[in-house]
């Protein structure tokens, strides 16, 4: 299927920053008097919240090298750099950011290819490439993105990020083709409900997405 969809499902920097705000809010009161891993993760998230993506990524990378049993540091390396790529127009910089994100994610995907949170970030990396150059990347990556979301949805159908991000991407395709977005809007509403009951495994586990979903709901037609 040929597509040159002008994917911008994440509304670049302003909307992506909601991820940072949400994460920092949940960890801000937690990191004092914790162990080295917790303190490092808290510091890295704080740096990200301050807009210091490069420093945050570097610290997450150091934590990942020291704590190989946790998938979260590399997850955040991938998320931080993918987030930064959405706000970048320079081709060389986008390539550097997304290559770093991909390498970090690959480490954890090799360990657990059925982690739905990792699958969502892989889909986001592909989407960042599409958003940067839809004419070149839309045709070859739109299909893999949908396959990733389908797999994630089969694994974790009640995960709000899976439901929301899948619907958000599908809305981009529907708008490009001029098809009805109501089914996707219904899925966004479902995701908002799932956020209300979703319980992260740890304070550092993924919990972002509600504010993005609420913004998408307001814009849903």
Language model features by range: what are they?
Residues 1-40:
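Bacterial Sec-dependent N-terminal signal peptides
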Residues 39-54, 59, 87:
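Alpha-helical segment of the N-proximal tetratricopeptide repeat
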Residues 63, 108, 151-152, 191:
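Canonical positions in the second alpha-helix
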Residues 97, 102, 139-147, 178-199:
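TPR/TPR-like (Sel1-like) alpha-helical repeat modules
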Residues 137-145, 149-152, 157-163, 170-179:
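Outer-membrane beta-barrel transmembrane domain signature
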């Amino acid at each position: 299927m040929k597509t040159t969809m002008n994917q911008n499902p994440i509304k670049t920097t302003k909307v992506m920053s909601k991820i940072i705000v949400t994460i920092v809010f949940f960890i801000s009161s937690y990191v004092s008097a914790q162990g080295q891993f917790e303190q490092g993760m808290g510091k890295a998230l704080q740096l990200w919240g301050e807009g210091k993506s490069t420093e945050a990524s570097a610290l997450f990378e150091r934590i990942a090298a020291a704590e190989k049993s946790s998938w979260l540091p590399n997850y955040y390396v991938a998320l931080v750099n993918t987030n930064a790529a959405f706000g970048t127009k320079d081709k060389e910089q986008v390539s550097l950011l997304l290559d770093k994100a991909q390498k970090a994610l690959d480490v954890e995907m090799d360990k657990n290819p059925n982690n739905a949170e990792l699958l969502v970030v892989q889909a986001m990396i592909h989407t960042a490439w599409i958003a940067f150059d839809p004419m070149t990347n839309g045709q070859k990556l739109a299909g893999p993105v949908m396959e990733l979301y389908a797999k994630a949805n089969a694994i974790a159908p009640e995960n709000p990020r899976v439901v929301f991000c899948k619907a958000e991407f599908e809305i981009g395709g529907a708008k490009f083709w001029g098809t009805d977005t109501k089914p996707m809007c219904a899925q966004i509403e479902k995701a908002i409900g799932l956020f209300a009951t979703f319980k992260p495994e740890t304070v550092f586990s993924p919990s972002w997405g509600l504010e993005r979903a609420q913004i998408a709901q307001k814009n849903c037609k």
